Amino acid sequence: MTDISIEDINELVASQLGVRVVTAHDRLMEDLGAEFADVANIIAAVEEKYHIVVKESEIARIFTPADLLQLVEKKVV
């Protein structure tokens, strides 16, 4: 199993959004200013990095990097 940390997810989100600091509970849209296309790019980067597939229905439940980490941890084996 691949070890995935919140720091890994925060760095990925920060890189995709072009921001310096991201915390686990920052809301992607409200706090970090992400738009739907940005979230789609974040999901695509996560899928590529961790070799997973995120369903459209799952995307609707991702509000923070912590939510994203929880989803990735469930899918990575």
Where do the protein language model's features map onto the residues?
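C-terminal structural segments of small proteins and small subunits
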Residues: V53-V77
